[in-house]
Amino acid sequence: MRAWDAEGKPRKPRVVCIGAQKAGTSWLHHQLNEHPKIWTTPFKEVHYFNARHCPEHQQLLPWHFREAVRATERRFRARGEEMPDEMVRYLVEMTADPMFTPKWYRQAFAPAPRGTLPLDTTPEYSTLPDAGVDEVADFLPRAKFIYLIRDPVARAISQL
């Protein structure tokens, strides 16, 4: 299990990774997850800002998020491991209503140990409207951003 601070205080991510579909965000997320100074949530995509600013996402995101939690549970079972109690509590809290509030978003990164950089990898942030981009800038003024892009033709072919 990754480093985990069960007593951690709610905090904001220090790094945000966004990008187009098939641009490599999953690969980069998994690579950064291996770095001892980067902390990632047990699920890749947090979806906070698009839940708040993309009405077309709002209906599906609670289900999608709960499914990501079930996938995390399946990964533990597949490895023959029991999920630690503190992670179970965390996942229950993350899937309880109300979701996608500022408090909820900060709580998503609370288990990140001191000295690590919490990472939010949500490619869909690249589709935010102007109001969403403004909220990101206001809410995360010190965050560093990674925007992955890919040749559009190669990306389209990879989706076939």
Residue ranges and their predicted role:
Residues 128-146:
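ATP-dependent NMP and nucleoside kinases share a basic, alpha-helical "lid"
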Residues 123-127:
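Adenylate-forming
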Residues 1-116, 121-122, 139, 143-145, ...:
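PAPS-dependent sulfotransferase catalytic core
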